[in-house]
Design a protein with these regions (language model features):
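Helix-enriched interaction subdomains in cytosolic or periplasmic regions
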Residues: 1-15, 64, 604
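N-terminal [4Fe-4S]-dependent radical SAM core
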Residues: 7-38, 45-46, 205, 211-262, ...
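N-terminal pre-triad scaffold of radical SAM enzymes
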Residues: 37-43, 58-61, 250-275, 301, ...
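Conserved SAM/AdoMet-binding glycine-rich loop
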Residues: 39-40, 113, 299-406, 410-447, ...
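Canonical Radical SAM [4Fe-4S] cluster-binding loop centered on the CxxxCxxC motif
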Residues: 51, 255-291, 599-616
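Glycine-rich beta-alpha loop elements in corrinoid/cobalamin-binding modules
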Residues: 74-223, 460-509, 516-531
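A glycine-rich phosphate-binding loop feature that marks nucleotide/adenosyl-phosphate handling sites
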Residues: 192-204, 314-319, 343-350, 412, ...
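Cysteine-cluster motifs in flexible loop/terminal segments that predominantly coordinate metals
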Residues: 276, 556-626
Length: 627
């Protein structure tokens, strides 16, 4: 066990990030289990502890008597300095065991700009970065999460990639690891990886060869062995009603980003917003019943003492039994001062009655996501809402006592013009004027938050070249010039960070050396604006003979091989191509939950179907797929 001396620990910011011992944390004797796993999140404690996936994995592994899971997060700059000064290796929170002593080190890949933190954590742990330099005496490096669907830029560092939902995969992997460990891993690491690759949803990068053309373009990724799959299909959990859910999560000692109980209403989203990678990755929609959700809420509140429950899914307002669920939750917790919160709401799903109910305990502002300022642009991205929808929702809200509205938009979308940007300002002014007309007061406020669009893999925009940073900055200045009212706040994201994010989102295996160069030059916590250094990143690319524009800004041909083609989210490329063509024509594609199947291919490929309780019972739809 690593000993932490309070004589120096008290001088770092928020020592509770590193002490462990939180309520509901689980401590096991490593000598009594067969498999030890460090669950890593490459960001600071407050961000990591807010992530539902970590909570699920922590409970999932620790419910087994033969396995132990502990947490490890990226130490903040001051703590890292102290650790390096005192030669303290990266350690787990539960038992302060050096990370290099675990059997498995499993990272959650949530955001491309956290990749340098992975390298920094490996260095602090004394673990070689490149998978080729590690034998079975080191922890096996495993990763999963949305970025795993193009893991190629960091594939050289990882041994195993879990694609899709991990509950069932995790048990299968631990069972195999336990059995092979007991036999002494006959045949060594490569033999073990070949066995792991037989688990559905598993990608082992070292078992594949990457080929490039003479011009330096990506050509192919092919397996080195006949028993290794050419493409890896994602895993899903069909029975979300009965799947494990963490009702006894660790309660942190300090405030975290999302410090509340979390209810996952359903998985997947079929709205089909064309900019949204998650909506494609996590199909099909699978709902939990209100009764199951109520029991989860009761157990979680009893086990944690939280006073807020957040209803979380990709589009929570689309939960088919939302009014019934809210009534059940409010009735259960009305005398316990436990509030219920909804994230940003789709305008067309908004019900003022629901909003009024969930804010009986604590009232806050309302958040909507029109995403674009004109109807043409909203149709291009398949948002499926109108200006009338937004103004109607705001009318109901203002009549019911709300004064504050936050609106989310994106900038840099395909086919976007200055007229579309002006529409953002117009909408903000219309909402503000609406508040004054309804209330007769001038105390209304509108927050306009605009992010820089980053094209992502496995979406209809995966072929689209990102707009130039200078053009984005011009657009940001232009929109700012149109907003001249102290009651309208305008926030926007840094364009340079989005540029690097796009490069790694659509990159290939050559980018691993860029990451190492950038890390060696001091890059880490790149998702934090105050620590992102654009010039250092440009130099890292140049030193490796690469250009970020090649990966981020280049529009790709439909028939061009893509570095992520072998990582199959089961939405067919034919469907994505059709959606791109529909976008160019500004044509809408309806939600298959409320209409006929659109042929995305997920349900027949996975032999599953949508699970929806809208009509009072379980609904499963027969579907087809575009090939």
């Amino acid at each position: 066990m690593i000993q932490l001396d309070t004589s120096w620990l008290q001088h770092v910011q928020k020592p509770a990030r590193y002490t462990g011992g939180e309520y509901n944390s689980i401590v096991k004797d490593h000598s009594t289990v067969d498999v030890t796993m460090a669950l890593a999140f490459p960001d600071v404690y407050e961000v990591a502890m807010s992530h539902l996936g970590i909570k699920i994995l922590y409970g999932l592994v620790n419910r087994r008597e033969d396995a132990a899971a502990e947490r490890v997060f990226a130490p903040w700059h001051d703590m890292e300095e102290e650790m390096r000064k005192r030669n303290i290796p990266l350690f787990s929170l539960e038992t302060r065991t050096p990370i290099k002593d675990f059997d498995v080190l499993a990272f959650t890949l949530q955001y491309e700009m956290s990749f340098t933190n992975i390298l920094n954590m490996l260095d602090l742990a004394g673990i070689p970065m490149y998978a080729k330099d590690r034998d079975m005496d080191f922890p096996l490096l495993v990763c999963g999460g949305p970025c795993a669907f193009n893991v190629e830029p960091i594939a050289d560092f990882f041994d195993i990639v879990s694609l899709g939902e991990s509950e069932e995969w995790g048990d299968e992997f631990i069972d195999l690891y336990k059995a092979e460990k007991a036999k002494g891993f006959p045949g060594g690491k490569e033999a073990f990886l070949r066995k792991v690759a037989q688990i559905p949803g598993t990608y082992c990068p070292a078992l594949y060869d990457v080929e490039y053309t003479e011009q330096g373009d990506f050509k192919s990724i092919t397996p080195r062995f006949e028993d290794v799959p050419a493409a890896v299909e994602k895993r899903i959990v069909e029975d979300v009603e009965n799947v494990f859910y963490p009702t006894k999560p660790v309660v942190p000692f300090l405030d975290i980003v999302h410090d509340r109980a979390v209810l996952e209403l359903f998985r997947g989203c079929t709205r089909g917003c064309r900019f949204c990678q998650a909506g494609m990755l996590y199909r099909p929609v699978r709902e939990k019943t209100p009764e199951r959700l109520l029991q989860i809420a009761k157990d979680t509140i009893a086990n944690t003492g939280y006073n807020e429950i957040s209803l979380m899914s990709l589009s929570s307002a689309d939960y088919s039994k939302l009014p019934e669920l809210v009534d059940m939750l409010m009735e259960e917790f009305k005398d316990k001062q436990v509030s219920v919160s909804l994230p940003s709401l789709r305008i067309d799903s908004f019900s003022i009655d629901i909003a009024k109910k969930v804010q009986q305990v604590r009232k806050s502002g309302l958040t909507f996501a029109p995403e674009a300022g004109t109807q043409r642009m909203r149709d291009v991205i398949n948002k499926g809402v109108s200006e009338e929808d937004l103004l109607a929702a705001c009318t109901n809200a203002f009549k019911s006592g709300w004064n504050t509205v936050k609106l989310y938009f994106m900038m840099g979308l395909p086919t976007e013009t200055d007229e579309d940007l002006a529409g953002i300002a117009d909408l903000a002014y219309k909402v503000l004027d609406l508040h004054r007309d309804i209330t007769g007061k001038r105390n209304g406020s509108v927050t306009v938050s605009v992010s820089f669009f980053v094209p992502k893999t496995h979406s209809p925009y995966q072929w689209y070249g990102q707009q130039d940073v200078e053009e984005i900055h011009r657009k940001q200045r232009y929109l700012k010039s149109l907003i001249n009212n102290r009651n309208i706040s305008y926030h926007y994201h840094d364009g340079y960070t989005g540029y690097m994010e796009a490069a790694f989102a659509r990159g290939d295996r050559r980018l691993s050396k860029v990451l190492v160069k950038a890390w060696e030059a001091g890059c880490k916590f790149d998702g934090w604006t105050e620590y992102f250094n654009y010039e250092t990143w440009l130099k890292a690319f140049a030193d490796c003979g690469l250009n970020p524009a090649y990966f981020a800004r280049r529009t790709r041909d439909f028939d061009e091989p893509l570095p992520w083609d072998h990582l199959d989210c089961t939405v067919s490329k034919a469907f994505l191509k059709r959606e791109w063509e529909q976008a160019v024509e500004a044509n809408l594609t309806s939600d298959c939950r409320r209409g006929p199947c659109k042929g995305c291919n997920v349900c027949p490929e996975l032999n599953t179907a949508i699970i929806d309780y809208k009509e009072g019972g379980r609904v499963e739809k027969v579907t087809f797929g575009l090939k």
